[in-house]
Design a protein with these regions (language model features):
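P-loop NTPase motor core
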Residues: 3-76, 84, 123-172
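Metal-dependent catalytic core segments for phosphate chemistry
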Residues: 71, 77-80, 88-94
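Phosphate-binding loop that captures ATP/GTP phosphates
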Residues: 86-115
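Conserved P-loop NTPase mechanochemical-coupling segment
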Residues: 107-130
Length: 172
């Protein structure tokens, strides 16, 4: 044990952090490979927004992200990313006719980040209320050509249990 402890002290593991101080401070070891981290809140409690912000933060730190939205379209996710990145009011993305000339210039100036986003932040399309097996297959299809540091599934309540299994056990 002492030898392992000394080795860990001399060669500490790099934590995968998202850049949100409150989250990084709570996640003592960061997002470690092979771990399952659950974020919970009441309906309308901001889980999806929080997971998107964590994912965007991880992406901005150079990590590949695989996002499985079980209730939100990728178009909506991308609009939220653009809003966060450019600080343009989300209502103008929701109604693009409201985007100003200044907004369009801002979007152009963020072209490189947007291009990088499309290469390092992938999503996997899954049907509404997928089973654990269907989610696993969707992830495995992406793993053939993309190696994510973090996989985000938003959100767990929309997962249907495989026939004859308990949902909580299958998810774990």
């Amino acid at each position: 044990f002492m030898g392992d402890l000394k080795e860990q002290a001399e060669n500490p593991e790099q934590k995968v952090q998202c850049g949100i101080t409150e989250v990084d401070d709570c996640m003592v070891v960061g997002f470690k490979p092979g771990t399952l981290t659950l974020s919970v809140a009441d309906v309308g409690g901001g889980k999806s927004t929080m997971m998107l912000n964590i994912s965007f933060g991880l992406f901005k730190k150079g990590h590949n992200i695989l996002f499985l939205p079980l209730e939100m379209s990728f178009e909506e996710i991308f609009k939220k990313f653009l809003c966060r990145e450019t600080l343009i009011d989300f209502n103008r993305f929701a109604n693009p006719a409201m985007l100003t000339d200044q907004d369009w210039e801002c979007l152009k100036s963020h072209g490189e980040v947007i291009k990088k986003f499309q290469q390092k932040f992938l999503w996997a399309d899954v049907k509404s209320r997928p089973t654990v097996a269907e989610i696993k297959r969707a992830i495995e299809r992406k793993l053939k050509y993309f190696q994510p540091a973090v996989i985000v599934i938003d959100y767990i309540a929309n997962i249907k249990p495989d026939a004859g299994s308990d949902n909580w056990l299958a998810i774990g």
